[in-house]
Swiss-Prot record:
This is Ribulose bisphosphate carboxylase large chain. Mg(2+) binds at K201, D203, E204. It comes from Drymophloeus subdistichus (Palm tree). The keyword Zinc does not apply. Gene3D superfamilies: Ribulose bisphosphate carboxylase, large subunit, C-terminal domain (3.20.20.110), RuBisCO large subunit, N-terminal domain (3.30.70.150). GO terms for molecular function: magnesium ion binding; monooxygenase activity; ribulose-bisphosphate carboxylase activity. It holds the Pfam family RuBisCO_large.
């Protein structure tokens, strides 16, 4: 053994395994303004104390490993380690705890959501000491959020680009999502936009399949968009999905969309990946394109209540990575979404400063220091009878997206769009006149349907449609 090796191995080093809590559980720690803070829902294995479980999470998501290593002596663990600084019991749940962990900012690469998630959730979720683990929330310090561009444009710039104010925007996903030719697809786009919608949308899995290659779809949709704009005098958009198998191909599609002069493109940010999404967001800001984000695959990550990651974390990550719209559930449609929790992460998307509010699932006060906001998109099983509730819940800075609720109209696509536009305008006018949308919503829709046969037909078709788990 060389003298150098003897020195390294002998000074202050004791080989073996020791409890994580001896190093990583620090209840006296005072968090810094520059720390990234995380709230984990921890379910320890039987016999594992909550302090050890919380410390294990802090260790395995920062500097720790399963045994002591002599190279610990070559750095300052106190400077770089994550710290579990507080643990609280989850009321009403057996053997579940909220473990609060603080991470020094130096652990993370600037401007990289990919690196942030790789560190915090990349490895620890398979840890044997834990029966289940869920990341409930993150506090992003201002010193870190300022290293991100964020959304390409944000809410106010989008309003100005579209010249549309004072109401939610209306959208529609073209159905059937797969199987249409590019020309028939473009026809549906035209009919919906001509009928009064602001946007139409590629579905998340419409990329470039044999029945409809991306370039053909882009061309026919652009033709439809320009024709509808000419006839209505309104600025229209279609979310052209640029998601592809490689980043290079994705960028090629975005470049072609810009050359066509369309206002907006789309990306599946979870299946496409945060690195690809951030690159696309930067391109969109540099080239004047709005960016619509679909959250395909989110329920794989966020649906389980005790394991995975809450969508509010994915929403914060998207605001940092970049997107002007993101799907956010409906509260009232076919997809899951609890009202207060949904409104909590909607505020995290749109607002500049959000106070801690545990009743809405917000574990930390978040200051975005003027990072542009993201417009939430309500989509999934909604129709004209939902319009009052959606207008009241989501407010003006939202996109209300009716796929089947437009294309399923008994008279066709354009009448379906007319029905939705009439219903929305009626709800906005009623709200502005001081009427209570929550209490008078159905009456408002019935009144409007008396002078709109398209709305009356839609009301009749969907009058008894509900998405209850007991059906």
């Amino acid at each position: 053994m060389s003298p150098q090796t003897e020195t390294k191995a002998s000074v202050g080093f004791k080989a073996g395994v020791k409890d994580y809590k001896l190093t990583y559980y620090t209840p006296d720690y005072e968090t810094k303004d520059t720390d990234i803070l995380a709230a984990f829902r921890v379910t320890p294995q039987p016999g594992v104390p909550p302090e050890e479980a919380g410390a294990a999470v802090a260790a395995e998501s920062s500097t720790g490993t399963w045994t002591t290593v002599w190279t610990d002596g070559l750095t300052s663990l106190d400077r770089y380690k994550g710290r579990c600084y507080h643990i609280e019991t989850v009321v009403g749940e057996e053997n579940q705890y909220i473990a609060y962990v603080a991470y020094p900012l130096d652990l993370f690469e600037e401007g990289s959501v990919t690196n942030m998630f790789t560190s915090i959730v990349g490895n620890v979720f398979g840890f044997k000491a834990l029966r289940a683990l869920r990341l409930e929330d993150l506090r992003i310090p201002t010193s870190y959020s300022k290293t991100f561009q964020g959304p390409p444009h944000g809410i106010q710039v989008e309003r100005d680009k579209l010249n549309k104010y004072g109401r939610p925007l209306l959208g529609c996903t073209i159905k059937p999502k797969l199987g249409l030719s590019a020309k028939n697809y473009g026809r549906a786009v035209y009919e919906c936009l001509r009928g009064g919608l602001d946007f139409t949308k590629d579905d998340e899995n419409v990329n470039s399949q044999p029945f409809m290659r991306w370039r053909d779809r882009f061309l026919f949709c652009t033709e439809a968009l320009y024709k509808a704009q000419t006839e209505t005098g309104e600025i229209k958009g279609h979310y052209l999905n640029a998601t592809a198998g490689t980043c290079e191909e994705m960028m090629k599609r975005a470049v072609f969309a810009r050359e066509l002069g369309v206002p907006i493109v789309m990306h599946d940010y979870l299946t496409g990946g945060f690195t690809a999404n951030t690159s696309l967001a930067h391109y969109c800001r540099d080239n004047g394109l709005l960016l619509h984000i679909h959250r395909a695959m989110h329920a794989v990550i966020d649906r389980q209540k005790n394991h995975g990651m809450h969508f509010r974390v994915l929403a914060k990550a998207l605001r940092m990575s970049g997107g002007d719209h993101i799907h956010a559930g409906t509260v009232v449609g076919k997809l899951e979404g609890e009202r207060e929790m949904t409104l909590g992460f909607v505020d995290l998307l749109r607002d500049d400063f959000i106070e801690k509010d545990r009743s809405r699932g917000i574990f930390f006060t978040q200051d975005w220091v003027s990072m542009p906001g993201v417009i939430p998109v309500a989509s999934g099983g909604i129709h004209v009878w939902h319009m009052p509730a959606l207008t009241e819940i989501f407010g003006d800075d939202s996109v209300l997206q009716f796929g089947g609720g437009t294309l399923g109209h008994p008279w066709g696509n354009a009448p379906g769009a007319v029905a939705n536009r009439v219903a929305l305008e009626a709800c906005v006018q009623a709200r502005n006149e001081g009427r209570d949308l929550a209490r008078e919503g159905n009456e408002i829709i019935r009144e409007a349907s008396k002078w709109s046969p398209e709305l009356a037909a839609a009301c009749e078709v969907w009058k008894a449609i509900k998405f209850d788990s007991n059906q």
